[in-house]
């Protein structure tokens, strides 16, 4: 889609340029009340990276002294303030003036604009034409004040600061390189697009901005200029920061703990374990008010919107239909996600021309007016017309977050990072080993954080993570609370809403409400059996315990990334498949870069596709937003983990091709990599290849003994080969077990008659020279599991050789009977290579015995596999055995137990518009067998995948919905009969008609 004259944004010169202009207008409006001089009148600056003074301080200086502060580099930016630039920027430098922040300080000191040339960091000068220096840099060495000299720090502070210096720049890179396009959950479909891109701008001097994802520069431009994704990645960044602090600290002590001696406990601590949950109060608002103290006490909201009249008269595309879009979103929230609050939010704030920007954070004064985080700005202004809005301050968030973590790390590193402003801390060692009064320490810590950051925080302390988080809710705002044995935990938890507990979302909450369970008190009064029936065994047990204040989860100090993803649901407007493929190639490169940077490889590749819903308007209420969409997930599991961009790109393109979606219907694309493995792990086959190479080199170095060659010439290239497999037997044709038994019986009869005639018994054996010989040196170098497999393979050949020796030549080999059922195999062993590994585990022995029994059972051929004319050709003495086999019942093939069950279900659903009753009965029998075999996890996997592909059918598929619900109901009835509880299926049929 190209931008035309009637799209509502042409008069601004584009959406991104409008955002830039909005930020400049905000800055100008905020500067007027505080302006003291016009020293920097007509001068604009843009801060690139870390500087001294900081970006916030430079912004305040420009605000007070008449200058302009650009949030993004623009063509008319006067100076770019920086301390250091990467090499790529230096080599690609244009005519921009990169100067030191010292220039601003010196201008203030002299109260005039000084020459910028001495403060230039880099220039485009050449050795043949050096730059002319018109002035000398000012020597400021004598003007340093004593207050600028920091006092000496103790050892612990130096260690934390050194790690921070090493990590902060890396974390800045992590926050940029681990960019996750803010993943829009289904609950946020109605509003997340605009909030993602409001901070987006361009650095192009011309109006050649990348307007849609079809533009080759769109993806790089989005990630280069949009900083809102930092919110989603700050948590991951600080989890890595805590890991690095722990690794660097090792077994060293904490000198800062010496200051806690004054906090000695006068009485015995009442809990065996102390867990603290610390959370900053209204984090975004608190950081923003540090530079806006005049706004304290007023209702404040952090958002991209200006507020005021600008938030109630937003331009809307002429072809957009807000009313239709509103109703579609509301229906989905109510019927699919069972979230009435979200539906009400859409209905009350998704009308007219009101701003759909979301409020990221609001002050407690605003909350008293009914405003909540995530609310639309237009809706909030209806509740509170005097609401003040402030912009994001990402550098400030990072600065305060580092200070918070560094302060806690001076006392303990038993930290579980949750986000940039929230963490769990284990205080048991401080309480018992140092005999410290826990609440006195918490008060001391909170005061230290406030003195360093100017931002308040609250803390809750209890015996586990769940109660500690609950205690924090009691402590807010700016307080602390201890939930110990003196409190009646059951009475405290009883009125708590169930959606406050971990793992309880809108879907689980809806099921609980249907069962008459609205709060923790209701669960306390019910039985464990009922909870397991409603939610399944595992989740039912967890919720049953949590409602009683029981939580055994330990703190996760070193958290390993389990997924890496990159997603884009703004500006996805393709006109052909070529544009779509080009964008997917770029997105694959982006997600691969993130994967490499965390030193991981992925085995599972998932492609998330957002397709415009059939009933949704083509143009969305939000410019270039995704609107109401159907979400399709396609996944592929590759053989080996990879971080190769070519492999990932190929898989992604294949998945997109399989989806077969028209390009103009796409509204969002995302790549998610899972099943991550350590990139430093080397695959076993590589080690084996290397071992064979070393053995070959060793053989070359060994002298050949005289006479070892025999009659062969010295030049024969087969002499020095380390392994000789020339006599390796050819692969045998698959033989039916019945034919082998028949031939063996005939051979035994012949041998018996021959022995009786001769009176002697001499075993008839096959020459074992045809069995491959093993090199003992090579065998000794093999890993244990491979060596056992090779030995077992050789023993198998020996057994075959002995068996062939008993074959009677007077009876030809009988032909194998035809197999009527292609799913039944007779000569495939269920044992894997790893099963040959010796194990002392009783469970392992039991598994091997069970597999052995299954293997023996599979050798039987059922009656439906035997053809009548084949039976007639058999000798008479074999017929009784065949008749005995015929009397055995026929076993159903296990269609859903293989690795290809997804392909089977996918083909079935895609090929049939209406499921046949016989097929449904077959699937039901398969699932029932799995339940009887206690394969409940596989039942859940099968039902989850089947439900997903049914939901993906865009045509009328209510017949499939009925079939699925029929099988689901049968499964639950069988589970209640056998196990006494029901299974929890996280996927469900999303159909308003069926509902």
Curated annotation (Swiss-Prot):
Its cofactor is Mg(2+). Keywords: DNA damage, DNA repair, DNA synthesis, DNA-binding, Magnesium, Metal-binding, Nucleotidyltransferase, Nucleus, Transferase. It comes from the Eukaryota. It is an enzyme of class 2 (transferase). Residues 136-164 have a biased composition (Basic and acidic residues). Disruption phenotype: Highly sensitive to ionizing radiation due to defects in homologous recombination (HR) repair. The percentage of full HR repair is normal but the length of the repair synthesis tracts is increased. It is found in: Nucleus. This is DNA repair protein Rev1. InterPro entries: BRCT_dom, BRCT_dom_sf, DNA/RNA_pol_sf, DNA_pol_Y-fam_lit_finger_sf, DNA_pol_Y-fam_little_finger, IMS_HHH_1, REV1, Rev1_C. Binds 2 magnesium ions. Residues 35-121 form the BRCT domain. Interacts (via C-terminus) with PolH/DNApol-eta (via C-terminal regions). Interacts (via C-terminus) with PolI. The active site is at 422. Deoxycytidyl transferase involved in DNA repair. Transfers a dCMP residue from dCTP to the 3'-end of a DNA primer in a template-dependent reaction. May assist in the first step in the bypass of abasic lesions by the insertion of a nucleotide opposite the lesion. Required for normal induction of mutations by physical and chemical agents. During homologous recombination (HR) repair of DNA double-strand breaks (DSBs) regulates the extent of repair synthesis. Its EC number is 2.7.7.-. Residues 135-164, 182-211 are annotated as: Disordered. Mg(2+) binds at residues 279, 421. One of its GO terms (cellular component) is nucleus. The gene is Rev1. The record marks 284 as: Substrate discrimination. DCTP binds at residues 361-367, 373, 421. Residues 192-211 have a biased composition (Low complexity). Disulfide bonds: none annotated. One of its GO terms (biological process) is error-prone translesion synthesis. GO terms for molecular function: damaged DNA binding; deoxycytidyl transferase activity; DNA-directed DNA polymerase activity; metal ion binding.
